Amino acid sequence: MGDKIVRATAANGGIRLVAVLTTDSSMEAKERHGLSYLTTSILGRAFSASLLLASSMKVMHGRVTLRVRSDGPLKGLLVDAGRDGKVRGYVGNPNLELDLVKTKQNQYSFDFTKALGTGYLNVIRDNGFGEPFTSTVELVNGNIAEDLASYLYHSEQTPSAVFIGEKIQNKNIISSGGLLAQVLPKKETDPLLVSLLEERCKEINSFSEDLFKSKDNLLSLIKNIFPDIDDKSISEKARTQEVRFECRCSRQRSLNAMKMLDKNELKDILIKEGKAELVCEFCKNKYLINSEEIKEMIKN
């Protein structure tokens, strides 16, 4: 079916619902970066979180950057997601493996708290004009969902519920995604809507399992929580959107980055290496800059 975003509203337009599937994007990141299953899960969660945030931006070229700076062995992460559904990202320590921990449900789970440690979640919203909006909150527990909910509560003062999860089977990520439920700004003071949101979300015992059982049917996933969604409140075109891992790097951008170097640095590269190879942090694509191109940079 492929990764996607599905949007809906409920309670006569008072509650906004967004579900995202990031299974394929997570697996592509795993292949590109050589991620462990722990870091694949963490990056997949960050993909879901950033896409959920970007989904509400008013312009198609709007982007959200989600960065974690922390003292855990993961060594941080950075994700860039667009309103257009394109996402990319990387973690500081792609090969990280940790022992599983037992959950309250007597099951085993990745130790996200230990992986990320203590630190901060930084969110940048860029509409492509004016100054980007930046906000930083402390990490709650490193599972990304609660960290994102904390950001929404402290930075946007919007009653929200966030669910993010994944399921791994036979050495594959078989489902990865998230769900965001928000009381819309004009309705946020309505205590009945806030109570409705809280009550419906209490019914979710294991989002990862619910996501897997939905078999990629995100609308069905949403309806399990809010069966009375407003089908006609969002146009068919805006309701479902493709999501994919896609990087914005290019050879020209690599050349431009090289041109930022001091001429003495360029001369040093030319003498010692005779060429330069630039590797994109987001997707691991490699760009070779030959000696003639470096000489031209030095001349100019």
UniProtKB/Swiss-Prot annotation:
Under oxidizing conditions two disulfide bonds are formed involving the reactive cysteines. Under reducing conditions zinc is bound to the reactive cysteines and the protein is inactive. SUPFAM superfamilies: Hsp33 domain (SSF64397), HSP33 redox switch-like (SSF118352). Pfam families: HSP33. InterPro entries: Heat_shock_Hsp33 (IPR000397), Heat_shock_Hsp33_C (IPR016154), Heat_shock_Hsp33_N (IPR016153). It is found in: Cytoplasm. It comes from the Bacteria. GO terms for molecular function: protein folding chaperone; unfolded protein binding. Disulfide bonds join C247-C249, C280-C283. GO terms for biological process: protein refolding. HAMAP family: HslO. This is 33 kDa chaperonin. It comes from Prochlorococcus marinus subsp. pastoris (strain CCMP1986 / NIES-2087 / MED4).
